């Protein structure tokens, strides 16, 4: 695989910001590690993980923040669905891709081989929570739980920004970055 180093920075566990270059892979899945050089010409390549840094930014492209979050394991592709709702999860330190930075909340995504998940960090809290979207089968038919709609409505109510127009758009929202933004 060819290298594609772009200008960026990493934030260490002690909060130090180190400028350099990150091998930008235009990831389809959230990266578990990145390659970082302080100097583009003859810099030593460091492999950094969620254990060693809290954030990395590829300038003009993407920012990823490390968070320890529950990651739902329930499948959403029809061929993989089961009769029972899969509520299993694991807790892991992962790099969440920052999609929106707001005054009150930030929106993140996490994609792996199973599915995409969206997370909200309510700035009154310290940990993001997953916006819940589940699928299962019932008598061979697909059943979808759109719990993320109630989660978004509740958050808007707590902040006093809920109105008829907002509720209307939430009631039609699909589990996609475009709608959840």
Feature names for model-found ranges:
Residues 1-180:
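Compositionally biased alpha-helical segments
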């Amino acid at each position: 695989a060819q290298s594609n180093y772009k200008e960026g920075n990493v934030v260490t566990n002690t909060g130090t910001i180190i400028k350099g270059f990150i091998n930008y892979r235009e990831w389809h899945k959230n990266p578990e590690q990145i390659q970082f050089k302080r100097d583009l010409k003859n810099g030593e390549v460091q492999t950094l993980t969620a254990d060693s840094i809290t954030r990395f930014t590829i300038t003009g492209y993407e920012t990823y923040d490390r968070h320890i979050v529950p990651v739902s394991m329930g499948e959403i592709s029809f061929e993989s669905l089961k009769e029972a709702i899969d509520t299993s999860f694991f807790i892991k330190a992962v790099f969440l891709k920052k999609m929106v930075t707001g005054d009150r909340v930030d929106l993140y995504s996490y994609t792996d081989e199973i599915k995409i998940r969206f997370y909200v960090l309510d700035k009154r809290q310290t940990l993001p929570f997953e916006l819940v979207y589940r699928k299962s089968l019932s008598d061979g038919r697909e059943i979808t739980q759109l719990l993320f709609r109630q989660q978004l409505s509740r958050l808007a109510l707590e902040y006093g920004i809920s109105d008829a127009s907002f509720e209307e758009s939430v009631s039609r929202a699909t589990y996609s970055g475009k709608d959840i933004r």
